[in-house]
Amino acid sequence: MEILPAIDLKNGFAVRLKKGEMNSAKIYSDKPWELAEKFADLGAKWLHIVDLDGAFAGEAKNAKTIEKIVKSTNLKIEVGGGIRDEERIKFYKNSGVSRFILGSAALKNPEFVKQMAKKYKIAVGIDAKNGFVATEGWAEVSNIKACELAKIYADAGVEAIICTDISKDGMLSGVNVKFSEEIAKSSGIKTIASGGVKDLSDIKALKQSGKIYGVIVGKAYYEGSIDLKEAFLIAK
């Protein structure tokens, strides 16, 4: 099972939010590229980056910072937040990004996502509030169930689905294993769990499930409630 440490960017700083609320941002670093180096030293293979400003604005706002992070590390990097067209994917690809996360586009423009999946390594980001898909930086909640959206991409050639339970995100309240399993079952696609990881017990629960490909760890690391080195050992 892969563990993907997370860097969420707001105005060039590494921050964490609670339940996706921008006014809850807590700054953890003004040099996010140094965090990337630290994660590599701890044993990470992947890094999960979200341009929070981009997610709300629908365009890349932290592109220069992301470029600097990519140049500072040999980690494979996936990026999401504000990717709505192929030009942005090309820009990030040329910067050295490995995988591109399409969230709002996955709900609003599935044909675009399917086309991009034929050309690039695409992860579909499915973020849910009470089981329903939320978009535009989680500011809008649709009437589409997360599992129904996952099914749409079953044979589309996307590389992974990243599923987030928004009610858990940034709360250190424990990961929603059942939700992640349902997404994996609905889609048959490698599923990465996100939101709520609090300690090593969450890593163990996801690993024991046997159905989850990966997990994103953010606030638990920044707040010191998880030993990442130990987490990588458990996930192996």
Curated annotation (Swiss-Prot):
Kindly list the GO molecular function terms attached to this UniProt entry: 1-(5-phosphoribosyl)-5-[(5-phosphoribosylamino)methylideneamino]imidazole-4-carboxamide isomerase activity
Where is the catalytic site?
8, 127
Entries under InterPro entries matching the protein: Aldolase_TIM, His_biosynth, HisA_bact_arch, Isoase_HisA-like, Isoase_HisA-like_bact, RibuloseP-bd_barrel
Q: What class of enzyme is it?
A: isomerase
Tell me the compartments it is located in: Cytoplasm
According to UniProt, the reaction catalysed is:
1-(5-phospho-beta-D-ribosyl)-5-[(5-phospho-beta-D-ribosylamino)methylideneamino]imidazole-4-carboxamide = 5-[(5-phospho-1-deoxy-D-ribulos-1-ylimino)methylamino]-1-(5-phospho-beta-D-ribosyl)imidazole-4-carboxamide
- State the HAMAP family in the record: HisA
Q: Which family does it belong to?
A: Belongs to the HisA/HisF family.
Q: What is this protein called?
A: 1-(5-phosphoribosyl)-5-[(5-phosphoribosylamino)methylideneamino] imidazole-4-carboxamide isomerase
**What species is given as this protein's source?**
Campylobacter hominis (strain ATCC BAA-381 / DSM 21671 / CCUG 45161 / LMG 19568 / NCTC 13146 / CH001A)
| Gene that this polypeptide is encoded by | hisA
